[in-house]
């Protein structure tokens, strides 16, 4: 449909929310163009891990987040570091990596479970859909500040602004 020109379409080719001089943006363009990634040694905003098998990749990702990056750059792994993967399912997808990273970085505390996902006080979360009523949008990142297991609700802090999520909203 898009190629036919019958329906109006817009191609988004500008990357927002990121320093345009970094390797993250450069490599995002390479991925979109089907080109090889640019990888540099030393201090950079982009690290690529090549692993022998998926299980090793998970272990290395956890090690990078919990030890290597905080030690080398003095960063808080919960607040300052982002793991990007291209899929949700399987051992290397966001679903599993989020569980493993939560075990390593935020293993204790009050929690609620929705649809198999555990939300724990202190977790970093990302809004997946625009919610105009709450004034939060796809890609916004916040931290779980409080949970109420009786009401199946939680409060997420987005840049100092608390937003309440009820049971049905937790899928957002």
Enumerate the language-model features and the residues they cover.
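Conserved helicase motor core of P-loop NTPases
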Residues: 1-125, 131-133
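Conserved nucleotide-binding/hydrolysis modules and their immediate coupling elements
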Residues: 99-172
């Amino acid at each position: 449909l898009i190629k036919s020109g019958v329906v109006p379409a817009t191609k988004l080719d500008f990357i927002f929310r990121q320093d345009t001089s970094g390797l993250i943006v450069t490599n995002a363009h390479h991925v979109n163009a089907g080109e090889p990634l640019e990888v540099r040694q030393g201090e950079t905003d982009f690290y690529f891990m090549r692993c022998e098998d998926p299980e090793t990749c998970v272990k290395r990702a956890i090690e990078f987040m919990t030890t290597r990056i905080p030690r080398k750059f003095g960063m808080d792994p919960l607040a300052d570091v982002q793991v990007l993967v291209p899929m949700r399912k399987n051992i290397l997808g966001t679903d599993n990596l989020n569980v493993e990273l939560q075990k390593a970085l935020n293993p204790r505390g009050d929690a609620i479970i929705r649809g198999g996902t555990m939300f724990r006080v202190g977790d970093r979360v990302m809004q997946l859909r625009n919610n105009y009523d709450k004034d939060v949008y796809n890609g916004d990142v916040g931290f779980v500040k409080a949970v109420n297991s009786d009401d199946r609700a939680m409060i997420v802090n987005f840049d100092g602004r608390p937003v309440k999520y009820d049971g049905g909203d937790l899928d957002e």
